[in-house]
Amino acid sequence: MKSAPRGAIFWGAALVTAGVVILAIQQGYVSDEILAEATRWWPLILIGAGVAVIFAGSLGVVAIGLAGVLLGLLIGGLVGAGSFPTACGDDEPGQLGSFADGSFGGSGADVQIDLNCVSLEVGGSAGSQWVVEADEESASDLELSSGDQRLEIRSGDSVSLGGRRHVAVALPRDGGTNLSTSLNAGDATLVLAGGHWGAIQVDGNAAAYVIDLSDAEVDAIEASLNAGSAGIQFSDQTSVGSVRLSANAGEFHVCVPEGVGLQVTIGSDVAVGHNLDDEGLTEDGDVWRTPGYTSADTRIDIVFSGNAAAFTLNPEGGCS
């Protein structure tokens, strides 16, 4: 019989272990005290990698499997705890000041925000004007370009040594603006409540998002996380065309009020955890629905996929 590739052994051990840890956390078998220490487990990555290198010879398969288990413990602990540390430090973001402003020439403008190690705030405002504010360190590094129907904001090439930067962006909320954000380390709060938005694209690497779509009209939202978390708030007046969420070693918290028809399709991926049965949804293959879904005035359809990932509906602490 042909032996399994070492890469398959490593990731198989990691994902199986992560899945077991996530399930143990969701079932309450792991105490809050242990979860509080989850973010301190990152040295397991170094230990696992070192073991794999040292014993890559005669004990290679065993070492690779052990390294995968160690990585799985870390991933499972972080996903289950919903806590993802970033490399930006704990310093408070700097005070905001004026940076740039302008206006769009019509509806359907495209906005691209691509930032590193930052606390980002995005909100909606009346009219066609956009406004960007930044703290002193961010202002010296931001690259901004704009046109009649576009706005691009990017981090420059310099490396931040003073902790998180601070950027705030106000956009027209009623013009069907298309918003794309990409965050590498840091956190973002997108307050898009009550607005009319086009397509919303969210990408995060070691990032934490809070997205408020209460009473908003959105053509589509797509969010992808790697080692991150996101909380998404819907209301009974939210209108959204499609919602696609994916995570690798990440977690989504989704808040939906009672009375909204919710359908969640869970992809057949590895080590994906959820609480949909606990929240009273009924299962039909890969699809979960709230009672009365078909007759609800407001319906929200979500497609979720991932590896070593978790989907939590209406968590006790909310989605903020």
What are these regions (language model features)?
Residues 1-320:
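Alpha-helical transmembrane segments and their membrane-interface anchoring/capping motifs
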